Amino acid sequence: MWKSIGELSCDDYVKAGLTLEDAKEFDKLVSDVITKAIETDPRDQWKALVDESVLKPWHPHPLHQLLYYSVYSNWDSSVHGPPLYWFPSLSQSKSTNLGKLMEYHGPRLLGPSYKNPLESFELFRRFSVEHPEVYWSFVIDELSLVFHTPPRCILNKSKPEGTWLPDAVLNIAECCLMPSSHPKKEDDSVAVVWRNEGFDDSPVNRMTIKELREQVMLVANAISGSFEKGDTIAIDMPMTVDAVIIYLAIILAGCIVVSIADSFAAKEIATRLKISKAKGIFTQDYILRGGRRFPLYSRVVEAAPSKVIVLPASGTELHVQLREQDVSWMDFLSNAKPHSSGENYYRPIYLPVESVINILFSSGTTGEPKAIPWTQLSPIRSACDGWAHLDVQVGHTYCWPTNLGWVMGPTLMFSCFLTGATLALYSGSPLGRGFGKFVQDAGVTVLGTVPSLVKTWKRTNCMEGLNWTKIKFFATTGEASNVDDVLWLSSKADYKPVIECCGGTELASSYIIGSPLQPQAFGAFSTPSMTTRIIIFDENGVPYPDDQPCTGEVGLFPQHLGATDRLLNANHDEVYFKGMPMYKETRLRRHGDIVKRTVGGYYNVQGRADDTMNLGGIKTSSIEIERVCDQADECISETAAVTLTPPNGGPELLVIFAVLKEGFKQQSGEELKMKFSRTIQKDLNPLFKVSFVKIVPEFPRTASSKLLRRVLRDQIKQELLSLRSRI
């Protein structure tokens, strides 16, 4: 139990890590600030402490905890909503991308109801939901889009999901590479900054738009010499500057990128190559991470691709022996067709806006990953989300440690190149100080994370002494945030906001998110994204009123720019629409999350409506986990996999229930935990980790023998709570 802020004394500050002398000064400073606000709302007290910079990034974390939790010690979230920690000022709001747009168009669109970006945000957001074609006509003009053939209109409403930018023809990669007057992108503008692990004291590398364009066109020429227009070409490598060049070059050449994460086992790579019918794959000989070298080419070859183009992880020479049909990066580039001018020029292949440019994968509940096609609309949606909700703009440097195999890789790239921001890449492990120093040295202004990454930084204290004060916004996605972890993160940049993002590969966007025009609460989403209408409904499909606190499954209105209208290996209608409730004569689109709407209109994601799991930000299924665990040892009769959210929030924990066969050597829970972990990491993903194993005599089932994972989840939750209370 925390004391109230008025009860804190010098002794409390000493216990939190200050020297006695510093504690006396700090006590006086806190008293001076709080005295002025002692009778006010705790939100005003916290705002005053932050505005006066009472807490510094270099203060020990227990001190930050002490003040935050003491200010809100008597706060009742069920009455007042979640405690807030960041409050945008009016001047800040008017300088944001969305704030400027609102100031310019708001009075005309909303009439006398329009006040300013802070007071009128929700009104304007609802306008964007009701009139998406008006909103998108404004925001699309803010991106560096170049249409070879302009769209006939913004939205044709003849179908339930609409047809967006009908008849438009373009090449979205070209839009990333060409100068523009608005946003202001010039040939000498910095497009990419990067640093390789192990060179932490070296200057940050820089590449201008012109240099990036020339490199992409060189590779596009080489691709045209080896592949045909429309071919699917995979990328399985870390998100280096070379990977970005290859990605854009594939699209510039009229081919389709197949995104494969560099963490996948050979079997998973093979599955994705087969589904996408990939004609070739770009990869590296090794992955360099944390001072170690991990084989990658050998893993890719085990997946039996038809052709591999192999880049060296460092230097110019490969450190592997290639198969006869495979080719080194340097030899591949030497086959590029030179342009008549002698320069690295390539004429882009222009395609309709609905053409597929990228195949990404998301695990479903059947064990086979869903092949999700991104069209040229998808990057537009992704970039617009970054523009509106993370305020990504010219002059900003945007970094998010990720991979082109996950949706955040392309999202990050297009959010930079279509808004005029600079893309920041660190080639190496983001877990240590080297990454943090790169964030400092590159002048990163928008830093994306996942909760498990933040937890590691906080636990190891590896970022101590670094200057992250240039950061304007943090972002986090993939899994639920732990409040104390994001308190730590925000404090490292003078309490800048951590924008929570929740969406999906199939949406090319978030559906709930934070906003620079709203106060933010740790671990909570403050709004549906611009133009997005969400409905929360109960177990009978009955929708809750929009302004009512509630918990239920979320459904999306189908008219969502950038969302998929097809899957390559599954029935799109069955996956996203079948069985969903109707709302105002419209069939809602399934996303599958259970969402809680709080008092005050904030949101928390409570888990999945089905048995899909979220492990370290990677969606997988109970069935897929169980399939490999069933083969982990001959004593296994059957297994059931569930996830559990820790009591204090944070990433989901993987729990395996096991029924053992009779007549075999009995195994302990710890022995099985090691075997399950090894099997899962070998056959599914090396990033997955088993937290608990529970041996049971049988599983609870329905009358039709359907496994009741929910009952198992509740059972282990109660056991852990009971154990915790005894401790």
Swiss-Prot record:
For the null mutant, the annotation states: No visible phenotype under normal growth conditions, but plants are resistant to 2,4-DB.
Q: Which Gene3D superfamilies match?
A: 3.30.300.30, N-terminal domain of ligase-like
Taxonomically, the superkingdom here is Eukaryota
Q: Return the PROSITE patterns for the record.
A: AMP_BINDING
List where the motif Microbody targeting signal lies: 725-727
GO MF terms listed in the record are:
ligase activity
Keyword Lipid metabolism annotated: yes
A Pfam family assignment: ACAS_N
EC numbers: 6.2.1.-
Keyword check for Lipid metabolism, yes or no. yes
A single Gene Ontology CC annotation of this entry is:
peroxisome
List, in alphabetical order, the GO biological process terms annotated in this UniProt record: auxin metabolic process; fatty acid metabolic process
SUPFAM superfamilies xref list? Acetyl-CoA synthetase-like
Q: In which tissues is it expressed?
A: Expressed in flowers.
The subcellular location is: Peroxisome
Q: What class of enzyme is it?
A: ligase
Q: Which UniProt keywords apply?
A: Fatty acid metabolism, Ligase, Lipid metabolism, Peroxisome
User: What family does the Swiss-Prot or TrEMBL record give for this protein?
Assistant: Belongs to the ATP-dependent AMP-binding enzyme family.
What is the recorded function of this protein according to its Swiss-Prot or TrEMBL entry? May be involved in the peroxisomal activation of 2,4-dichlorophenoxybutyric acid (2,4-DB), a precursor of active auxins that inhibit root growth.
Recorded protein name is Probable acyl-activating enzyme 18, peroxisomal
